């Protein structure tokens, strides 16, 4: 109760002290009319927005006829050398490699309900067991070749599992069936 009672002189003093240390308010930009104009008016709309000439090489992902799967799915299929580099990366991080496959849908879909559930394409079948203790990328690539032979019309992905934090750290499509 005592702290809420102040004299009006104390309020005025503290307000003036706060105003003395304040910065002047922003008054806006200067008028462009005061600067001399030495260039002609360009009505070409392509010159308005530019990122240094790189606009011509950018492409837009086609929304029809191409499914988006997971990480790196927008790229062309990875070669064996590129797969080995990705696998070596996850092994160097100390993650456990594991293969998973899906025979019907290699992408998220809604069949039984509109909200995410078990049967929406997120959960794939594990190929054998996680490769605990694996230190050679060619072993993982060999398992991938076996999975391709067993299920040639399936999507196969490689995941890297961190068994300390118990999370999946990397996942990418290693094989797509013909026609996808």
From Swiss-Prot:
Primary localization: plastid
Source domain of life: Eukaryota
Pfam family, one: RuBisCO_small
Keyword Transit peptide: yes
GO biological process, one term: photorespiration
Keyword Cytoplasm in record: no
Transit peptide (first-last residue): 1-56
GO-annotated molecular function: ribulose-bisphosphate carboxylase activity
SMART domains to which the protein is assigned, alphabetical: RuBisCO_small
CC terms in the record's Gene Ontology section: chloroplast
Alphabetically ordered keywords of this record: Calvin cycle, Carbon dioxide fixation, Chloroplast, Photorespiration, Photosynthesis, Plastid, Transit peptide
Locations listed in the record: Plastid, Chloroplast
SUBUNIT field: Heterohexadecamer of 8 large and 8 small subunits.
UniProt-recorded name of the protein: Ribulose bisphosphate carboxylase small subunit, chloroplastic 2
Source species of the chain: Petunia hybrida (Petunia)
Phylogenetic placement of the source organism: Eukaryota, Viridiplantae, Streptophyta, Embryophyta, Tracheophyta
